[in-house]
Amino acid sequence: MPLFSTDKFQIEIERNWKNIYNISETVIPPDEREVAAMIDQIMEYNKKFVENKGYEPFLTSKYPDKKLAILTCMDTRLIELLPAALGIKNGDAKIIKNAGGTMVHPYGSVVRSLLVGILELGVEEVMVIGHTDCGVQGMDGKEMLELLEKRGIDKQHIDIVRHSGIDLENWLGGFESVESSVHETVKGLKE
């Protein structure tokens, strides 16, 4: 199977996510046809991309040429901007993205991804990069929980997670400044 083919099954799972988790209709945009049409357009584009071998200019090994991993924010403005600003190209680095470009837990996916990069893929340097106007800056965990409840997440489910020892307010909370967030993340990764 070509490197960049997609799986319709995964899309169907995502379309039915609200039914699996009993989330109210407010989570899904009002016009599901628009969403379905957008997904169909993406999948059709991908089909043609694979058929035309559009992926060939991007082929590289799984090992980063610059032996570099970058932890950064998932902000849409960084998709092309960050590599351009750093002078890196496809194949140069492992880029790990999440909300805020932070490490929330020492046993979370960020640390796991970095360990795989270091131990299996030859990463020797790790950069943590924040950015101005980050949506996570100033985020309030309590307000996020209220938004979840407004979106139909049952308070009982939230309480179950709380009683299992997860500090949801902290987990969903943001940071006060980008600079301090980067410093705290670097400090946490070094520990």
Regions found by a protein language model. Give the residues of each.
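Divalent-metal-activated hydrolytic enzyme cores
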Residues: 9, 13-66, 101-106, 119-121, ...
